[in-house]
A protein has these predicted regions:
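Minor-groove-contacting beta-hairpin "wing" of winged helix-turn-helix DNA-binding domains
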Residues: 220
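A short helix-turn-beta junction within AAA+ P-loop NTPase domains corresponding to the substrate/partner-engaging
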Residues: 1-14, 25
């Protein structure tokens, strides 16, 4: 289990939020280091083909066994992305609750999301919508109500709601357009994911969300 691969120690003294997360939430045992390095070596090409972005700013992906070990089950681009998401929500869609922009907020996001995956076995990856549960308490009622109604309406599939959460999270982030390629990458949840099948699933969800007037069609 992923849970068995971490040695979690919390000490918020680092200046850099992603380093805080890596050192205090994602620190692995020696045995886990070895297992994850071997796993990466076996799946490096698969991961390279699975994770890609189109017309986006630089989004860092796994670059080596060490990169995979240090960030797993998260993907390197998610650290910078979630920093941008925190800023965007604070500026555009936040409640009156305190949502700081520093390392404590980002640590909380990754810690809660890591806990959600703690029973999973090696091979799972964190999809971006997983972070929404850690964010939703800070989202204003206008935005939160739309997602809550989508969850409770009984018309949409569960995957549709996850896509809706993702679209909300990147709504104000110009560095990563919400095209099908990028949405597909951010919805990846397993190393053995069939990217083509996932892409078709994303397209079907977008069509249903458009039909329910929850989103508008824009570009690709």
């Amino acid at each position: 289990r992923i849970q068995d691969r971490f040695q979690t120690r919390l000490n918020l003294t680092a200046a850099n939020a992603d380093e805080v997360v890596r050192k205090r939430v994602l620190q692995k045992t020696d045995t886990a280091d070895s297992s994850l390095s071997i796993f990466y070596g076996q799946h490096e090409v698969v991961l390279r083909n699975l994770l890609s972005f189109k017309n986006a700013a630089t989004m860092h992906l796994y670059s080596s066994p060490a990169s995979f070990v240090s960030d797993y089950p998260f993907i390197p681009y998610q650290f910078e992305l979630m920093g941008r998401v925190l800023t965007a929500i604070r500026e555009n869609a936040a409640t009156g609750l305190n949502l700081s922009s520093g390392e404590r907020s980002q640590l909380a996001l990754f810690m809660k999301s890591a806990i959600a995956l703690k029973e999973e076995r090696i091979g799972v990856l964190a999809p971006v919508p997983l972070f929404y549960d850690a964010l939703k308490g800070f989202v204003d009622s206008i935005h939160a109500t739309v997602i809550n109604r989508a969850e409770e309406g009984g018309v949409l599939e569960a995957f549709d709601v996850e896509v809706l959460k993702l679209l909300f999270m990147i709504k104000y982030i110009k560095e990563i357009p919400g095209n099908v390629d990028n949405l597909t990458t951010m919805m990846v949840s397993r190393v053995d994911e069939d990217r083509l099948a996932l892409s078709k699933k994303v397209v079907a969800s977008l069509e249903r969300l458009i039909r329910e007037t929850l989103i508008l069609r824009s570009g690709d």
